[in-house]
Amino acid sequence: MSIKSDRWIRRMSEQHGMIEPFEAGQVKQANGERIVSYGTSSYGYDVRCSREFKVFTNINSTIVDPKHFDSGSFVDITADECIIPPNSFALARTVEYFRIPRDTLVVCLGKSTYARCGIIVNVTPLEPEWEGHVTLEFSNTTPLPARIYANEGVAQMLFFQAAADDICETSYRDRGGKYQGQTGVTLPRT
């Protein structure tokens, strides 16, 4: 698999709707102020998180169980920024909707601006023929509250394309993946 450049990302997004909405360059300012950048970079695409957040709370003192997840463990917030409590996490979703080609795998890495503040972004790889808004998990590893900004860059997507003779036999769509076509912040499913 080879990593794909800005030219490929632009072409696939503009001609095939791989990323919508799509920003062909890097956006570093909004309303005359510097922001955490988003858009196309040399070998990736920096995504934004939407204004939709789910902040984890221990109000119910439950056990976190991915097979029997209690949605009451979250507080829903719609805002331009989100405060994550110390040693806790929040879920959000990308502004961008993705349609991944059958010969492509996408890996997500956190942006260094957040990582240097102790905020870690975790996302499972976007598999071939998956589509939807990406649910993002932000871990605040610090003993202090941490702030996330909506509509600014939060993570970078790296695109890897398989050789023509090595395309997967079964894609995410073929398997009927449980997160196919997700919109909004999506909680764990089994």
Curated annotation (Swiss-Prot):
Root EC class: hydrolase
EC numbers, comma separated: 3.5.4.13
Pathway the protein acts in: Pyrimidine metabolism; dUMP biosynthesis; dUMP from dCTP (dUTP route): step 1/2
The keyword Hydrolase belongs to this UniProt entry's keyword annotation: yes
Pfam families, per the entry: DCD
Binding site for dCTP: K111, S112, T113, Y114, A115, R116, T135, L136, E137, Q156, Y172, Q182
CDD domains xref list: trimeric_dUTPase (cd07557)
Catalytic function, reaction form: dCTP + H2O + H(+) = dUTP + NH4(+)
InterPro entries attached to this UniProt entry: dCTP_deaminase, dUTPase-like_sf, dUTPase_trimeric
Active-site residues, record numbering mapped to chain: E137
Annotated keywords: Hydrolase, Nucleotide metabolism, Nucleotide-binding
Gene Ontology biological process terms, A to Z: dUMP biosynthetic process; dUTP biosynthetic process; nucleobase-containing small molecule interconversion
Keyword Cell cycle annotated: no
Molecular function in Gene Ontology: dCTP deaminase activity; nucleotide binding
PANTHER family in alphabetical order: DCTP DEAMINASE (PTHR42680:SF3)
Assembly and binders: Homotrimer.
Function: Catalyzes the deamination of dCTP to dUTP.
Family per similarity comment: Belongs to the dCTP deaminase family.
The protein's name: dCTP deaminase
